Amino acid sequence: HSIRRRQRQMCIRDRPNTYQVSNGIKNIPMKGNLKSDYGLPNESIVLSCFNQSFKIDKIIFESWMNILKNLSSAYLWILEDNEVAKENLTECAKLHGISSDRLIFAPRIDRDRHLERLTLVDVALDTRIYNGHTTTTDALQSSVPVVTIMGKHFASRVSSSLLSLIGLDELIAHNTQEYEEKIIKLCSEKTYLKKIKEKLSNDVCMKKLYDIKEFTYEFELCLKGILKN
């Protein structure tokens, strides 16, 4: 048993930056669509969560409801995962005093059309226990800020690792209060939101998110370190 334990320990290495590798979005479709094309008021603040519904837990949903209470012109755009989840989320919103028409459900569509609609989002809201992975990357590469809560286990730290990689630690919260405050600040301060979006549009900054050569080099170093031991 001690030999096996040592072997397992030898295979554990900290990956610098993030575990996730992406080849990036080459060309994000830009067709000048309006929010109203997707059932959203054109003058609204659009908050989105396109993560699968099983990632939404009671605590994070309550935070979303608190945010909607603080932002009267905000709407929550959620992936329409299945009918049961849709009904449950709608009922939960009502229990928190939020009108069901402020939850807009987005059907699954092909990737190009999804990236096209993603550009209409003001701020993306990450889930807590199980973060977005590709969902977070898609948002960031579409110049949409993602606010996350950094947890203590792997699946709850993915988005924070991606944000840290591109120098946006300011979007990482450590509890629900911070999470709500950061989202409300982004939505309330247009100059601040614009600054964050401009940073996400910076190719030099974003290149780190999909630098496959650098990722491969760092991964090879990890493997060499394992072999040495």
List PLM regions with ranges.
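Hydrophobic/aromatic beta-strand patches that form the interior of the parallel beta-sheet core
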Residues: 13-16, 106, 123-125, 147
